[in-house]
Structure formats: structure tokens, C-alpha cells
Swiss-Prot record:
It comes from the Bacteria. Homodimer. The lineage of its organism: Bacteria, Pseudomonadati, Pseudomonadota, Gammaproteobacteria, Enterobacterales. It catalyses: isochorismate + 2-oxoglutarate + H(+) = 5-enolpyruvoyl-6-hydroxy-2-succinyl-cyclohex-3-ene-1-carboxylate + CO2. Binds 1 thiamine pyrophosphate per subunit. It is an enzyme of class 2 (transferase). InterPro entries: MenaQ_synth_MenD (IPR004433), MenD_middle (IPR032264), THDP-binding (IPR029061), Thiamin_PyroP_enz_TPP-bd_dom (IPR012001), TPP_enzyme_TPP-bd (IPR011766). Catalyzes the thiamine diphosphate-dependent decarboxylation of 2-oxoglutarate and the subsequent addition of the resulting succinic semialdehyde-thiamine pyrophosphate anion to isochorismate to yield 2-succinyl-5-enolpyruvyl-6-hydroxy-3-cyclohexene-1-carboxylate (SEPHCHC). This is 2-succinyl-5-enolpyruvyl-6-hydroxy-3-cyclohexene-1-carboxylate synthase.
Amino acid sequence: MSVSAFNRRWAAVILEALTRHGVQHICIAPGSRSTPLTLAAAENRAFIHHTHFDERGLGHLALGLAKASRQPVAVIVTSGTATANLYPALIEAGLTGEKLILLTADRPPELIDCGANQAIRQPGMFASHPAQTISLPRPSQDIPARWLVSTIDQALGALHAGGVHINCPFAEPLYGDMDETGVEWQQQLGNWWQSDKPWLRQALQLESEKQRDWFFWRQKRGVVVAGRMSAAEGKKVAEWAQTLGWPLIGDVLSQTGQPLPCADLWLGNGKAVSELAQAQIVVQLGSSLTGKRVLQWQATCEPDEYWLVDNLPGRLDPAQHCGRRLLSSVERWLELHPAEKRQPWATVIPQLAGQAWQAAVASNEPFGEAQLAQRIRRYLPEQGQLFVGNSLVVRLIDALAQLPAGYPVYSNRGASGIDGLIATAAGVQRASARPTLAIVGDLSALYDLNSLALLRQASAPLVLIVVNNNGGQIFSMLPTPQDERRQFYLMPQDVDFSHAAVMFGLAYHRPDDWPSLDEALAGAWRRAGATVIELAVNETDGAQTLQQLLAQVSRL
């Protein structure tokens, strides 16, 4: 019997089972122990293959693919720390709902805890972060093929959101020619090989029912809070709120068009907070709010009813409101809860939102990151999408910009880390094939510099704007100790990214005013492939501009 041949047949069943659950994209890192999985994936024509030498970046590439495709994405890595490098992407997927299937090759049990090379304790290593965990045995013909395929089906069929960790031990030899070993074992599955359905099918029914008293609450004074949702849902939410006559507080990831722009500015005004206190019901559609003032208001508001609608399970409400947690997609919830045409009840808030927007526009002439955030709408590619990094840049765009309704916006706002942002943006672009504008800070770019390699395969124009304010300037907005702030919080690196772009063969520009930025972007959207545009800005201007606008709007 050929061990290497049966390893591959075992892996082929696993990979074929994944295709029955909508897996098209598969991300593969180099490794020897993962050879059976890699070769099985390479031979399966149902897959679109993606490769990367860095497992941490590979995990985030898969995360971006899952975000834009809205399909489960598989990842193959070898044993040891290669597996551990998937942890950040898995954590993010668990918090934002993307389905990642991690196939981690492993040493067989007899090589664990005995000093064998590249052998760590992988079963259960991700603790509670995966939605499902499967620790497979070593491949054996004594285990029926139908057990293997039904084990995969059970886990994926029950997967509502988040990751699945499938640990796959393989014994050596891993290489060799294929022979007839395991053919009869595979044939136990009969016509399954010719079908496109799972071996084990199960229905996943998790959505909440229609709220029978909605007809009553829709006649009251309400507020709509829009968190993370799809572009199509964002447009529908904006129309729904307008019909109800309820003010809409739209997050940067809501894709609602933010009809009341600059919410994170005007929520610092006492008049707005007083008017919102008259609301009898707050309906929050989507989680993961960004703005600090939005979160502060959300934490202190006390309506008669607080409803939170999201298709992810769990509370998702750090303020622990008394109310209803409704498990549903936003689109389905809107279908079940139609709006009734009513006159707007809030009069102060629209005025404040308009004044806040005018204040932001009036401050947009100097060349800086706050001004870039306010102007961002004019730089979006037609029929494209926006990927927003974390830390200061996402807060500036959330507070100062007004994005088009229904324009796709992506970000990693689950755990809100600065790791893997370039890789995630690359995955979003690959899955959608749209022109993509991605914006990250300089520390985020340094953290994920390896992933510039992934941008070389962009299928449509991709522009990565690196806002270089020389460090983590978000900490200048926090009460960090003055004497220790620069060394221990801001950590300026005094770098530019020209050589990084050259190393990976990417086009590079470093504009120093708005006309030169306009010119660089116009050229980037006309050429195929990726372009890095570095904006070297004054270190403190972005944070100071935001603080000045907050103070100005609070006095209106």
C-alpha cells in the first residue's frame, strides 16, 4: 500500500467536499506536510488558486476574498507556526462573519510532544475563535470515506458565520507516484463524485421572525443606526429611514450615503443629543460602529425599545441595552418590516448635520489627511470600491466624508487591527475584479509590507494610498502621557515607501499637493495593475483638524 497515494485520495475527498458548500477560492502557502492537500487542490478544477509565501498575509487575503465574494474561502498551510500565523485572520472572520475554512496540515500523533521537528499541538490551538473545529485522524482505509465526507458536511452545513479549523495529520511518505491504493475506498461514495451536492444536507434556520408589534413602533419617534452592511442593503436602509421620517446615523461601512453626514461631529453637540433623547425606539441595523461620539451616544441613549438587527449571532451591543436582539440579514428584515410614510420628527439634527458638513468642507484646502478624508468621494473609481484601513484614517473618513449611497466599502472593523490590511484589500479586489482604492496609514503599511507582493496580480486598477504621518498619530488624540507619547505610542519610523514599491515592481507616486494627487490618480485608473501613492503629511495636522472641527461643531 502506498501511504503517499492514499494521503492524496483522503485529501481529495476533503477538497471535493468543500466545493459542495460553495468554496471556489482556495489560498495556498508553500509547505511539505501540506503536500496531499495542495496537490488535491491543484487537481480540482472547481478551485481558483491563490498563493502567497506569508501565512499571515495569506489568511488576510482569504478574508478579503470572503468579504467581496460573500462565499466561504479555504486556506491550506503546513504544520507548526505556519498554522499559528492564521490566527489574526481567523479572529477577524469570527467577529465580522466571513466564512474561512482553515486546512492545517499536521504531524501524525506519534510525532507530537517528542521533540520532532515542526511539530506543535495544533488540535484546538485556536481556542473558541473558530465556529467549528475538526481534528481529523491520520488517513486510514479502516475509516469509511462516508465518515470523512459527512464530518466535513456537518461542520460546514452548520456554519452560519466565522471560521472552521480542520486539522489534517499526514504521515510520511508525502511524495510518490499515484497507484491504485485507495481507489475502492473512494468508490464507497458512488455517484457523489458525479453530483454537485453535499453528502449530508442540513437546513440552517436561524433568522428571527417578523415583529408583530412593528406596525405600532413604526408610528413612533425613532432613530436608525446603520452599521456594517452590504452596498445593496445600505441603499435600502437609507430609503427605509427616509420613508419613516427617522434620522439615520450612518457609519462609514453602512454604505447608506450618510444622508446626515459628519455624525461623529454633530453628536458632540448637546442640541443633537437632546433631540435624539426624544426617540422612543432605536433600530440598529448592522454592528461594528466606528465613530467615538456615535459610540458614546449609543452607550447612553435610553429609548423605550432598542432593537439590534444583524445576521451574526451574539449580543453585539457593548452598551447592553434592554431591548431585542434580532438575528436576520438586513435585507430580509426590511422586507418583513416595511416603512410607513411619515413626516420627519427631528428638526435640529438636519440643520446641525448641514452645518457640520460645511465646516468640514471649509477646512479642506490644506494638503493633509483630514482634508483627504473629506475629499475622498471625488477620488473613488467609477464602478469601483473603497477599502479603508484602521486607526486614524477610518475615523477621519467616518467623521468628515459623505460616501455615495450603495458604493461598496470594506474594512477590517471586527478586531480593528492594523495587521493584514493590504492583504485583505488584495483579496477584496481579486474576488470582485473591480477598480479599488485602498487607504492605510504608514504603520499599517509597514506591518503588512510583505503583502505588496499580492498587489502584483491585481486584475483591475488598484491604488494603495499610504497616508504617512510618521507614526501612530491616533494616540495624539488620546490622553497618553506627554513625555512618553512619542517613544512608546507614536513610534515614528521616518521612512518612505518608494523602495518598497520598486522592490515589488509597483508604480509609485509621492504627490505633495492636490493637483499632483489628481494627476497621479488619473494615471493610475488608466493603467492596469497596482499603484502605490504615498502622501507624506504633517504629523499632527489630521488629529488637530478633527479636534478643531469637533470643538467648532459642539458650539453651534
